[in-house]
Amino acid sequence: MLFTEILGQEHIKAHLTQSVNNGRIAHAQLFVGPEGCGTLPMAIAYAQYLLCKNTENENTGGNESCNLKFNNLSHPDLHFAFPVAANGVIKSHPVSSHFLVEWRELIEEQPYGNLFDWYKKIGIEKKQGQIGVDEAQDIVKSLSLKSYEGGYKVMIIWMAEKINTQAANKLLKLIEEPPNKTVFVLITEDEEQIINTIKSRCQVLHFPPLSEEIIKQGLINKYSIAEDVAGKIAHQANGNFNKACDLVYQDTEDTQFEEWFIFWIRSAFKARGNKNAIHDLISWSEDIAKTGRETQKQFLQFCLNFFRQALLMNYNASELVFMEPKSENFQLEKFAPFVHGNNIIEISDELQDAIYHIERNGNSKIILTDLSIKLTRLLHKKAS
């Protein structure tokens, strides 16, 4: 993968290439950035620059046969680990090596893809993937071997926040004192979920969200769409190129999430003193509970963002509002006055608590019903 194929992040490209040119390569690095900012493509381009001894701050000019191997991510000294779970084909002890064909397809099709895209790709969208102890054993085994081409070995661990405790304990010593010429690149969207004993052993690089202009140019170059359309999509994407690509194809799950959200909000408004609306909320909770836990977490995160957007609209920060509801009968401007300083913190806390409990395998129907009843009270709270 060429550095020129990666949108923006020029200061990070310069830092990484200079560190290789100067021979100052940290053995463990943590790339931290929000979805769609390019952490994974950057890690792959960095690995190529390092393994192929490229020059001129680009992935050319070095070992051409090595560069060719990176075209289909088949270099023997490039290793990947990522969250997995058992599916219809792999029934037990799933590890990343079982899913490399699908992984390469995902990077070819959606290098800026998110965790949910990956779960859908391997058919585990109703499960929660993890990087477990079997994966840790595979990592230890693969990195104990000598490098195939006599140079560096690179281990890219994508979504490192999904490393469970047992795997983290097994990897700790290896990350602290890796074999000679071994580089770990851990990638995360949530730095706080990385255990401190691992984070403290890594050099941390923070990736900012992409600017609207960079996303706009990326969309024009990739899809040849009109500049004004690309500009509108870039604004809605809020720094996330993966979301921008989904919006081009109208392939975003946000459309379904918006329908669920609007029904939920309307039922919550009606539920005060209306028994029938309470039944609607319970039925809604049952329907959402039938989806996978990853879908539920994605949806609740969408709700969190929707409430924040409404708050910004209510306090006249319209330039920061990027959401545009597709429903003809729902207007953000009319909903915004019900989200204010007197209830937003409680709403946010309740949503984050629900995400926490769902992630830890709580009963989704009970969690969502409880959240719905609390939302009914909070939406009727008066602004102070």
Would you name each region that the model predicts?
Residues T165-N169, K297:
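Conserved strand-to-helix beginnings and helix N-cap segments that scaffold or border functional pockets
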Residues L2-K162, Q166:
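Clamp-loader machinery-focused feature within the broader ASCE/P-loop NTPase space
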Residues V154-W158, L171, T182-T188:
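Structural recognition of the conserved hydrophobic beta-strand(s) that form the central parallel beta-sheet
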Residues S144, N169-V183:
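Conserved catalytic/switch belt of AAA+ P-loop NTPases
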Residues K141, K173, S200:
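Conserved adenine-binding aromatic site and its adjacent loop/helix in ATP-hydrolyzing domains
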Residues M1-K69, N180-V183, E189-F302, F306-S384:
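Charged, glycine-rich active-site and insertion segments that engage polyanionic ligands
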